[in-house]
């Protein structure tokens, strides 16, 4: 049986909401899996008076980094200051009942669950958010029902959704603009407290939610479900994947009306449509992109139950052709995962390994897939991993693609291979906190005392210039005696945000 939107929130207690958003939602999944906020969560939860109140009330800057998307365009992600983010998650946890009431009020009229990606419990995980999580037993698929009797489909999305949202729009959505404006000076009401906490994770700015931390997804849903309520009340039949809308209508004129209504609802929260991605398409349309069927129905050449060299070559050639035609690296992603499930001959494995390594240098979006879907199934040797890590690192430093550089160092740490191209100067001359951190971790692992000292000296300079913007590197590299305020308290307690690789 499918669940209603409010049912998902009802299954999450206040404590689990706090833990899920902070301990398992502070660091985005786009990062190499070496980060943890669990130690800090347990420390702060067990000793809530550990930090002076004056330190807890301050706004803080964030660490920014770019991650490549399947369209070969980078997206800007963020890592928040731990105290500011903890306090935001605590606020959301404290007011879980009010949030539950809000979501119930905004979604009660829905005949199906409009929002498809949201905070929820997940099987075998304490995290409360995942872009790709789906449970067919309780999520259902409303699209076939929505299509019946309709002739057109509208696709639209919000222009720079998270970056365009205002923290002040949270009270607007929660209690209405009139009440919010009448009480905007009252710092004691919970919705204004939430506004303030949301500002403090972004250096006191009112404009934009951080991309990456899971709390941002809950904040955005506060606003987006309020917009949903107006659209559902107007009897529009649609679904929403965060900021992507798909609406089913009987005529082209109705499609235009939907866009007018959507534009009007978004405007109330100072949001706008991305006109480049707005489309009105005649029905019927395929349920999935055509390239998926092409890949899944392709007859792979086998010998004695194993896919041959020729079979893998033909399959990857086809996948590359589809990727170039559709300009979407996700197609190679899909093909890699399809092949990983198959039994290949040794020659086929070797070809697959070398081709994927070749493609990962050209398309950085594929790099995070390498450990699970390439190195492991195709038995990459230390020599293979060292070679590709060296190529990735040199290319990345030259092009300032620091995501590729940190993954190259991560591979060297995980698989215990040397990376001679890594120098302290690479990190010091960059503006990337994460590159500085990973270079520090590399020298710490290899025991390069001289380079470690260079990095420590650099960290001390950054501590005086822009601690918040580089806090992860500065905190992890400097000893307790060179830290001050909350950082010294955390270091004394033995807290680290890095797990053993």
What is each model feature region?
Residues 1-188, 193-211:
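Conserved two-metal-ion catalytic palm core of "right-hand" nucleic acid polymerases
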Residues 106, 171-180, 227, 263-265, ...:
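Generic alpha-helical propensity signal that fires on short helical segments
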Residues 252-310, 314, 318:
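Polymerase palm active-site segment centered on the conserved acidic dipeptide of motif C
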Residues 76, 80, 237-238, 272:
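Short, surface-exposed helix-loop/turn micro-motifs enriched in polar/charged residues
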Residues 88-99, 173-174, 227-231, 262-266, ...:
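Hydrophobic, Leu/Ile/Phe/Ala-enriched alpha-helical segments that form helix-helix packing faces
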Residues 144-241, 247-259, 304-501:
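Conserved polymerase palm-domain catalytic core
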Residues 64, 140, 224-225, 266:
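Intrinsically disordered, low-complexity segments enriched in polar/charged residues with Gly/Pro
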Residues 2-8, 12-14, 81, 166, ...:
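General structural signal for secondary-structure boundaries
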């Amino acid at each position: 049986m499918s669940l209603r939107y409010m049912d998902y929130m009802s299954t999450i207690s206040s404590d689990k909401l706090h833990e899920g958003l902070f301990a398992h939602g502070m660091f985005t999944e786009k990062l190499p899996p070496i980060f943890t906020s669990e130690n800090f969560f347990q420390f702060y939860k067990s000793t809530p008076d550990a930090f002076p109140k004056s330190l807890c009330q301050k706004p803080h800057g964030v660490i920014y980094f770019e991650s490549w998307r399947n369209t070969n365009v980078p997206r800007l992600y963020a890592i928040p200051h731990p105290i500011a983010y903890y306090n935001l998650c605590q606020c959301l946890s404290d007011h879980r009942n009010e949030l539950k009431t809000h979501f119930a009020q905004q979604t009660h009229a829905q005949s199906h669950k409009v929002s498809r990606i949201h905070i929820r419990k997940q099987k075998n995980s304490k995290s409360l958010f995942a872009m790709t999580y789906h449970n067919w037993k309780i999520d259902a698929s409303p699209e076939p029902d929505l299509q019946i009797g309709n002739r057109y489909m509208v696709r639209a999305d919000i222009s720079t959704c998270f970056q365009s949202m205002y923290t002040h729009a949270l009270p607007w959505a929660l209690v209405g603009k009139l009440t919010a404006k009448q009480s905007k000076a009252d710092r004691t009401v919970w919705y204004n407290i939430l506004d303030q906490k949301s500002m403090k994770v972004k250096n006191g700015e009112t404009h934009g939610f951080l991309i990456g931390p899971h709390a941002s997804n809950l904040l955005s849903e506060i606003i987006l479900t309020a917009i949903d309520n107006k659209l559902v009340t107007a009897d529009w039949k649609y679904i929403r994947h965060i900021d992507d809308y798909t609406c089913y209508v009987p005529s082209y004129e109705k499609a235009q009306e939907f866009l007018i209504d959507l534009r009007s609802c978004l405007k109330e929260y100072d949001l706008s449509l991305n006109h480049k991605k707005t489309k009105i398409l005649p029905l019927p349309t395929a349920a999935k992109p055509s390239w998926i069927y092409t890949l899944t129905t392709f007859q792979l050449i086998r010998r004695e139950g194993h896919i041959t060299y020729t079979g893998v070559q033909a399959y990857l050639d086809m996948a590359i052709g589809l990727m170039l035609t559709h300009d979407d690296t996700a197609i190679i992603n899909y093909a890699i995962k399809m092949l990983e499930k198959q039994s290949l001959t040794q020659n086929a494995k070797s070809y697959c390994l070398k081709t994927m390594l070749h493609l990962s240098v050209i398309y950085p979006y594929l790099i995070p897939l390498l450990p699970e879907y390439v190195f492991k199934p195709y038995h990459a040797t230390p020599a293979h991993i060292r070679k590709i890590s060296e190529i990735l690192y040199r290319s990345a430093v030259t092009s300032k693609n620091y995501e590729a550089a940190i993954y190259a160092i991560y591979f060297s740490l995980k698989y215990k291979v040397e990376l001679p191209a890594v120098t302290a100067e690479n990190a010091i001359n960059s503006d990337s906190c994460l590159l500085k951190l990973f270079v520090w971790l590399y020298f710490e692992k290899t025991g390069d005392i001289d380079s470690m000292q260079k990095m420590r000296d650099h960290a001390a300079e950054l501590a005086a210039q822009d601690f918040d913007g580089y806090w992860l590197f500065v905190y992890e590299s400097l000893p307790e005696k060179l830290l001050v305020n909350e950082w010294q308290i955390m270091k004394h307690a033995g807290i680290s945000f890095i797990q053993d690789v």
